[in-house]
């Protein structure tokens, strides 16, 4: 009996060292013991750390307000204020809807909740006006996976080309195959106007790259569980698939919709047909963006989109052509503007790059002449700067390079100022 009492006294908590007599409870697990006091302490530590982690996660996932979203877009994208407002509200409502559905899922369902339906976005506007960049910047702010697809590369299932499921694969790849993250991402489909059907009436023959693609996109736009082949390509019966629910993926589809303004103008009776009608070849004579703001579903149907496809794109945002003044701002003002990027490259070679006002205006004018908008600015900058950047690493005597209007037009060589000896040696 004394020996049993002695062995009980020898049992101690493996963590704090207290004996069985000094604590209320001693729990055995294999060759170790833990007392009730250590268990309580562990629970407090876990609760504290989990609480901090949840707080950090909440701060990280704080949903920005529409005004904050628009202000963030302003730091990267010049102009397009009406489109920014529409996109900011649409994106805010979309992710607010996701949070609401998660909250409803966590609490008791005592009464039926109002169902919030997803609102995908249609963007109308000319090439080089910033449609893609707006979508990319939104994804950057929200820290969600983002994928870009070209509608012209898509074909209906069973035909040569790219299946619509490959769009979802791109999103999965952007999310490092994290399905949960991918299901909250953004997919941008460009050139959607190029998949309009060939006539307003339903086609008798197969239109595999037009109406057929629109039909294939319907399900993923609305929400479906798609089977995605991890390696891409066509589906085979024996391969493994990743199941991806598209219900909460935000789709932004965009296109130039050249010719849609005529459809809208005809509906409004602004133009007639026949002799005596003044025909203008200059788009500048009519504010196309203002006309696009009056777009109605029947106009898009006449253009070649099927009604079911239009119905999945309730939010419409229009972007305008950038004028010379706006293009100059694109070159200089955004946080990652082209001028700032090239100036940084020159700094790495211990030189200062300076553009005069007339040089910036000339670059903007060339982009307007080429009808490439902001998208063509980098190519023009490269044409001007590549010869200089080729020689600069070998020119230790150069401290500053000045680009003026004549240089931008190709009529003169850039002015190169000598480097200060102290700066180069430093």
Curated annotation (Swiss-Prot):
- Please give the name of this protein: ATP-dependent Clp protease ATP-binding subunit ClpX
Q: What residues does ATP bind to?
A: 126-133
Q: Which residues cross the membrane?
A: none
Q: Which family does it belong to?
A: Belongs to the ClpX chaperone family.
InterPro entries per the record? AAA+_ATPase, ATP-dep_Clp_protease_ClpX, ATPase_AAA_core, Clp_ATPase_C, Clp_protease_ATP-bd_su_ClpX, ClpX_bact, P-loop_NTPase, Znf_CppX_C4
Tell me one GO molecular function of this protein. Answer: unfolded protein binding
Q: Signal peptide span per the entry?
A: none
Described purpose of this protein according to its UniProt entry: ATP-dependent specificity component of the Clp protease. It directs the protease to specific substrates. Can perform chaperone functions in the absence of ClpP.
Q: Which residues bind Zn(2+)?
A: 13, 16, 35, 38
Per the record, the domain of life is Bacteria
One annotated Gene Ontology cellular component of this protein: HslUV protease complex
Organism the protein comes from? Corynebacterium glutamicum (strain R)
Tell me the ranges covered by the ClpX-type ZB domain, including all copies.
1-54
HAMAP family cross-referenced by the UniProt entry: ClpX
Q: Which PROSITE patterns match?
A: CLPX_ZB
Q: How does it assemble?
A: Component of the ClpX-ClpP complex. Forms a hexameric ring that, in the presence of ATP, binds to fourteen ClpP subunits assembled into a disk-like structure with a central cavity, resembling the structure of eukaryotic proteasomes.
Q: Which keywords are on file for this protein?
A: ATP-binding, Chaperone, Metal-binding, Nucleotide-binding, Zinc
GO BP terms: cell division; proteolysis involved in protein catabolic process
């Amino acid at each position: 009996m004394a020996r049993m009492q002695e062995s009980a006294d020898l049992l101690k908590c493996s963590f704090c060292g207290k004996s069985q007599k000094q604590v209320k409870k001693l729990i055995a697990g294999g060759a170790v013991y833990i007392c009730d006091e250590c268990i309580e302490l562990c629970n407090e530590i876990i609760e504290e750390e989990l609480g901090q982690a949840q707080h950090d996660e909440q701060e990280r996932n704080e949903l920005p307000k529409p005004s904050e979203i628009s202000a963030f877009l302003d730091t990267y994208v010049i102009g397009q204020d009406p489109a920014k407002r529409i996109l900011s509200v649409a994106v805010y409502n979309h992710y607010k809807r996701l949070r609401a559905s998660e909250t409803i899922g966590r609490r008791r369902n005592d009464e039926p909740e109002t169902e919030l339906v997803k609102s995908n976005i249609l963007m109308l506007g000319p090439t080089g006006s910033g449609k893609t960049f707006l979508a990319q910047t939104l994804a950057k702010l929200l820290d969600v996976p983002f994928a870009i697809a070209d509608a012209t590369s898509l074909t209906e299932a069973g035909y040569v080309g790219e299946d619509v499921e490959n769009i979802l694969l791109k999103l999965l790849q952007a999310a490092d195959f994290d399905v949960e993250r991918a299901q909250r991402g953004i997919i941008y489909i460009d050139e959607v106007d190029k998949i309009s059907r060939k006539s307003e009436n339903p086609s008798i023959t197969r239109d595999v790259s037009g109406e057929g693609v629109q039909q294939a996109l319907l399900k993923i736009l609305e929400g479906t569980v798609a089977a995605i082949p991890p390696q891409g390509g066509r589906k085979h019966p024996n391969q493994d698939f990743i199941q991806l629910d598209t219900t909460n993926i935000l789709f932004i589809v965009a296109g130039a919709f050249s010719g849609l303004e005529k459809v809208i103008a005809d509906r409004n009776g602004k133009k007639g047909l026949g002799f005596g009608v003044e025909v203008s070849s200059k788009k500048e004579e009519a504010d196309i963006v203002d006309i696009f703001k009056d777009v109605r579903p029947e106009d898009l149907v006449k253009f070649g989109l099927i009604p079911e496809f239009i119905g999945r794109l309730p939010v419409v945002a229009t972007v305008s052509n950038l004028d010379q003044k706006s293009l100059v701002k694109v070159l200089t003002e955004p946080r990652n503007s082209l001028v700032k990027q090239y100036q940084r490259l020159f700094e790495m070679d211990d030189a200062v790059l300076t553009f005069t006002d007339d040089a910036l205006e000339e670059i903007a004018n060339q982009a307007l002449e080429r009808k490439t908008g902001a998208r063509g600015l980098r190519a023009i900058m490269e044409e001007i700067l590549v010869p200089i950047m080729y020689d600069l690493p070998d020119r230790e005597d150069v401290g500053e390079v000045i680009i003026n209007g004549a240089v931008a037009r190709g009529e003169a060589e850039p002015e190169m100022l000598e480097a200060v000896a102290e700066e180069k040696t430093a």
